[in-house]
Amino acid sequence: MDLTSWAIFPLLLASIGVYGLYKLLQKLRSGAYLQAAVVVITGATSGLGKECAKVFYAAGSHLVLCGRDEERLKDLVQELNNMRLKSTQLHKPHMVIFDLSDVEAVNTAAKEILHLAGRVDILINNAGISYRGTILDTKVSVDRMVMDTNYFGPVALTKALLPSMIKNRRGHVVVISSVQGKISIPFRSAYSASKHATQAFFDCLRAEMSPYDIDVTVVNPGYIKTNLSLNAVTGDGSGYGVMDKNTADGRTPEEVAQTVLRAVGERRKELLVAGLVPTLAVYLRTLAPTLFFSIMSARAKKRTKAKGFITNSNLKAKITVCI
């Protein structure tokens, strides 16, 4: 080793030590932030929402679990109450039953949430629906239904709870969006539109809430291995009942829930939780849009030919419910 190498070596060790100390302090702050925080989670009966309930409960948060299925929420509460953690004080969760697509029900639910918990520190807008179909064969009523749940529902609940957060000068709004809030792919028009609207709204909200010290985190996951496609219904209400390959190969909800927990604890502004190909697609859309459009066109042509999507009569819009 020459003199320069000997000089660099202690600097490198010092840098590693400083970084390690920074990560330790960050973890401690994150734990203190989540412990005893009042956390509201929509779509808590299954999938990512259910796993988020588990990890935030284990972190010591006070939970308000929201969904449409009372029995499944009761089962989740029982499961959480059966957890035993020596190092963390656990708090009995509350339940609020309502339909996110009903704005009046959302406003009533917000009042009930504040009555039960007294305040809301962290709101996790997780509930939503997914969609499959061609634009030509999709009724406007289907587009509206997707928008009601994925966009207007979270917007209504957020607006109803914001005054309380502003009054307390404390709050954190989280929305589970999608990679498709960043890019649009064929045969996902209603879903992509709802997630693009969600991305835009909460980006605006982040800026407008900064004077009040209220954080906003947008999480953009790719495919998650849940019952998303198994619970699908078609445009006429019949069941779809198929586990899509991309969904089956996706990340586990447990893994994504841990990522959400860390992102909230670190007060991240935005987070992309996706594999290499979707991540590259997001950057390609920005850096080389013409190439991205060509790839999407080729994808649409290939699938149209394979599926025989020619007339309005040969495709039913598929809607996947995840609430």
UniProtKB/Swiss-Prot annotation:
NCBIfam families: PRK06181.1 (NF004825). PANTHER family: DEHYDROGENASE/REDUCTASE SDR FAMILY MEMBER 7B (PTHR44196), DEHYDROGENASE_REDUCTASE SDR FAMILY MEMBER 7B (PTHR44196:SF1). The chain crosses the membrane at residues 5-25. It is a single-pass type II membrane protein. Putative oxidoreductase. Substrate binds at S178. Residues 1-4 are cytoplasmic. Its EC number is 1.1.-.-. The gene is dhrs7b. It comes from the Eukaryota. Residues 26-272 are lumenal. It is found in: Endoplasmic reticulum membrane. One of its GO terms (cellular component) is membrane. One of its GO terms (molecular function) is oxidoreductase activity. The keyword Oxidoreductase applies. This is Dehydrogenase/reductase SDR family member 7B. It comes from Xenopus laevis. NAD(+) binds at S46, L48, Y191, K195, T226. Keywords: Endoplasmic reticulum, Membrane, NAD, NADP, Oxidoreductase, Signal-anchor, Transmembrane, Transmembrane helix. It is an enzyme of class 1 (oxidoreductase). The active site is at Y191. The lineage of its organism: Eukaryota, Metazoa, Chordata, Craniata, Vertebrata.
